[in-house]
């Protein structure tokens, strides 16, 4: 068993989702859970967000989609059977008192209709776990390929089609199955990675038969610099996207990623698809600075206070919106991740002692050095050598020497003696040192910090 623990606070992720939904108002909010939910657990996160009425989950590949669908199908089966067995108990009393959480009950409140008598008074009827499962949309961002098309159909996955070849493949399997197949189209408006090009979009506009057999549910695009609020390229992409959408007036649209949500309602359309912001990462550069506005609003079950920054005007409505400040739900986005490692070795070193590979650190005094059981094999970058920090009881402790595959050394000399003992936990990631802060030390982004978290940690969901 791993000595290190990675705690993922699902309540924090839920709260981040609810905050984003508040900002998006009437637009739907989905969730990017690709790369195993940014390293935090796609299945667990999806279940938690389903309880908050999230119904759109974005993965990168068909493999990720199949794994998620299988897990959710199994969960829906168990939940359905639980409700079927305990429906009478649930109906007659407060569900919370019967070991059924309020969120759990709310999500499956539709089952009241499934198990209720028909209007004509005839026998009780029920839906199926499959019907519950089909209510959850799993979108595959990389699209469809010949080798996985049947798998997408079998597991009810919706591909985001990125070029005419993928459209052709999906149309071929539509003909094979003799039914409409659901899809999203991705229009490239300037990020120049995936997405139909301008010439390909013109072909679709001029020849709608290219989409025959396809159930086109959404048209999406992706912003290149949404974290830079004042970058004019955001508006360029928005205008390009709107121009294309004029030719598809009855199709829903999605543009905003995490940063796009904070660009204003012009960017929200029918569906936003945040990733980073769900996991407590700053979606906008300098988001946590310049507190300037405070607003109270009424939630469904409680009164919340949210602090915001940088009041901006929405060009489409003339109304203002506010950007949330880091730090706890009542102040904005929460960090849901805490990584802890215990001290497994202590030693007293004299002045001029060398530490770690290649002797990159030399003590400048008599020192107490502690060793923690994690390293670059666990996603803790070697770039933290001699420049990172951890926290013990809220006190900063420097990393000394090279990060090795499985171990790091820290200098605990300045800690109170009572805080220095074998088994004492050091906080590697947490509220003292968020993924964004860690990323800034080594010149990367919080996304990379989270997705690099290794498989050897004991993961605890709360």
UniProtKB/Swiss-Prot annotation:
The modification N6-(pyridoxal phosphate)lysine is found at residue 34. Belongs to the alanine racemase family. CDD domains: PLPDE_III_AR (cd00430). Keywords: Isomerase, Pyridoxal phosphate. Catalyzes the interconversion of L-alanine and D-alanine. May also act on other amino acids. The keyword Isomerase applies. Residues 286-332 form the RPE1 insert domain. Pathway: Amino-acid biosynthesis; D-alanine biosynthesis; D-alanine from L-alanine: step 1/1. It catalyses: L-alanine = D-alanine. The active site is at 34 (proton acceptor), 357 (proton acceptor). This is Alanine racemase. InterPro entries: Ala_racemase, Ala_racemase/Decarboxylase_C, Ala_racemase_C, Ala_racemase_N, Ala_racemase_pyridoxalP-BS, PLP-binding_barrel, RPE1. It holds the Pfam family Ala_racemase_C. The lineage of its organism: Bacteria, Pseudomonadati, Pseudomonadota, Alphaproteobacteria, Rickettsiales.
């Amino acid at each position: 068993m791993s000595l290190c623990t990675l705690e993922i606070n699902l309540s924090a992720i839920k709260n981040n989702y609810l905050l984003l939904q508040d900002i998006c108002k009437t637009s739907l909010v989905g969730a990017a859970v690709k790369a195993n939910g940014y390293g935090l657990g796609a299945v667990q996160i999806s279940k938690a967000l389903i309880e908050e009425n999230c119904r759109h989950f974005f993965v990168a590949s068909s493999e990720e989609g199949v794994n998620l669908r299988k897990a959710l199908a199994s969960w829906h089966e168990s939940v359905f059977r639980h409700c079927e067995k305990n429906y009478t108990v649930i109906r007659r009393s407060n569900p919370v008192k019967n070991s059924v959480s309020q969120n759990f009950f709310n999500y499956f409140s539709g089952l009241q209709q499934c198990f209720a008598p028909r209007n004509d008074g005839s026998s009780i009827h029920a839906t199926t776990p499959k019907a519950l499962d089909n209510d959850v949309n799993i979108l595959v961002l990389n699209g469809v390929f010949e080798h996985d098309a049947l798998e997408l159909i079998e597991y009810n996955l919706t591909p985001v089609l990125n070029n005419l070849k993928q459209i052709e493949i999906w149309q071929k399997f539509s003909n094979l199955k003799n039914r409409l197949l659901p899809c999203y189209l991705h229009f490239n408006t300037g990020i120049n990675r995936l997405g139909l090009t301008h010439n390909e979009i013109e072909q679709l506009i001029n020849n709608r038969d290219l989409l025959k057999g396809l159930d086109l549910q959404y048209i999406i695009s992706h912003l290149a610099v949404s974290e830079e609020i004042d970058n004019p390229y955001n508006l360029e992409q928005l205008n390009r996207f709107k121009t294309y959408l004029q030719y598809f007036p009855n199709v829903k649209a999605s543009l905003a990623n995490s940063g796009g949500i904070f660009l204003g309602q012009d960017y929200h359309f029918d569906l936003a698809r945040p990733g980073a912001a769900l996991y407590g990462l700053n979606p906008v550069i300098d988001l946590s600075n310049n507190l300037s506005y405070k607003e109270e609003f009424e939630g469904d079950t409680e009164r919340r206070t949210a602090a915001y920054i940088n009041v901006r005007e929405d060009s489409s409505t003339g109304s203002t919106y506010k950007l949330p400040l880091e730090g706890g739900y009542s102040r904005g986005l929460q960090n849901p991740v805490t990584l802890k490692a215990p001290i497994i070795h202590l030693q007293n070193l004299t002045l001029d002692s060398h530490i770690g590979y290649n002797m990159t650190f030399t003590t400048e005094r008599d020192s107490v050095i502690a060793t923690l059981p994690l390293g670059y094999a666990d996603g803790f970058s070697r770039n933290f050598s001699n420049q990172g920090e951890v926290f013990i009881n809220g006190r900063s402790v420097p990393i000394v020497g090279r990060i090795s595959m499985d171990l790091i050394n820290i200098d605990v000399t300045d800690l109170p003696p009572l805080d220095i003992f074998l088994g004492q936990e050091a906080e590697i990631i947490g509220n003292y040192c968020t993924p964004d802060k860690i990323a800034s030390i080594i010149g990367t982004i919080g996304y990379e910090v989270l997705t690099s978290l290794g498989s050897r940690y004991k993961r605890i969901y709360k």
